[in-house]
A protein has these predicted regions:
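Catalytic-core region of carbohydrate-active enzymes that cleave or remodel glycosidic bonds
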Residues: 56, 61, 190-206, 217-235, ...
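Active-site mouth of glycoside hydrolases
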Residues: 1-225
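Single-residue recognition of alpha-helix boundary sites
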Residues: 145-148, 237, 288
Length: 308
């Protein structure tokens, strides 16, 4: 996303030649700031990204993007987490737990969306070529909260406080039915803070979130978004040991059209539906079926966005 201009033009030409009309700009948040500090935008790399957006727009190609994907921090940036933030999965958990991290997120979102692209003349929030915004990439709280044992302990302590305030039993920890209510409350509080900031800066772009994993709990959270977005992979490599990975080498068809079929129940009848990451992973012998299955079902169910 921050490539030299000549590469932006070449890639935009190539995408237009193939007939693509939408590109997702991804993993750029770490490149567009200096040292992970959201208060210090990297002007040169942001300029390159602006040029890419403009180059795509000139060829009739729209853009969608994320606010947080993989930005990392040196020591001392997050008061409650003084050590360096090297694992971006931890950010998604810290975002729920601490106001300071949410404030950092809102600051970067405000800066990047209010920034004027010199090649289009639009602020990102007003640019018609930028069609939608994803907030935090793959941030399902049901799968993220306990990945870091230190942060999981904080979650459980907060849950006990949550139960005391409501005169609920806290036994069972995360197995307690009230634990999901606790997680949902944390998430909805943050989502409303984001919504309020977007209203404040005058951003009316469609917004989505919770694009990782599937299930009723996440469907309820996606109802609070403007559209549903899902990520889906067939035969994603499975780690074996420290360095080796293996593939199943299975077709999706005898697996009940696992991909894209697994996303069918995730649609919400009153919301546009998108898949911003989908792939039959390289080295799978059945990758040729991907285009036929994906195109057929996307047309049958009238999906609104598909990005490989």
């Amino acid at each position: 996303t921050t490539m030299p201009r000549e590469w932006s033009d070449r890639i935009a030409d190539r995408l237009a030649m193939f007939g693509f009309n939408l590109v997702r700009l991804h993993h750029h948040d770490g490149e567009t700031v200096i040292g992970g500090d959201a208060r210090r935008l990297h002007k040169e790399k942001l300029d390159r990204m602006d040029y890419l957006i403009a180059a795509l727009a000139k060829r009739g190609i729209y853009t969608t993007t994320d606010i947080y994907v993989s930005r990392k921090f040196p020591a001392g940036v997050i008061p409650e987490h003084p050590e360096p933030l090297k694992n971006y999965e931890d950010y998604k958990v810290l975002f729920l737990l601490y106001d300071s991290v949410c404030d950092e997120f809102l600051h970067y979102m405000r800066e990047i969306l209010s920034h004027t692209n010199p090649y289009t003349g639009f602020q990102w929030k007003d640019d018609p070529a930028i069609v939608s915004i994803s907030l935090l990439n793959e941030n399902s709280c049901t799968t993220q909260w306990n990945r870091n044992p230190k942060l999981a302990k904080v979650f459980l302590e907060r849950f006990q406080q949550f139960c005391r305030e409501r005169n609920l039993q806290a036994e069972g920890g995360s197995a307690n039915p009230a634990f999901r209510d606790f997680l949902d409350g944390l998430y909805r509080k943050r989502l409303e803070q984001i919504r309020a900031e977007l209203r404040k800066i005058g951003c009316n772009k469609p917004v989505t979130d919770q694009n990782f994993q599937r299930g009723t709990f996440l469907a309820l959270q996606r109802e609070a978004c403007d559209y549903v977005d899902i990520h889906l992979y067939h035969d994603h490599p499975v780690r074996v040991g420290e360095k080796m990975r293996r593939f199943l080498q299975r077709s999706a068809i005898p697996l009940g059209v696992e991909v894209p079929g697994a996303c069918f129940p995730e649609r919400l009848i009153d919301k546009p539906f998108a898949i911003s990451e989908i792939e039959y992973c390289t080295a799978n012998d059945f990758r040729a079926e991907h285009a036929a299955l994906l195109g057929t079902y996307a047309a049958l169910q009238n999906w609104d966005m598909v990005i490989q």
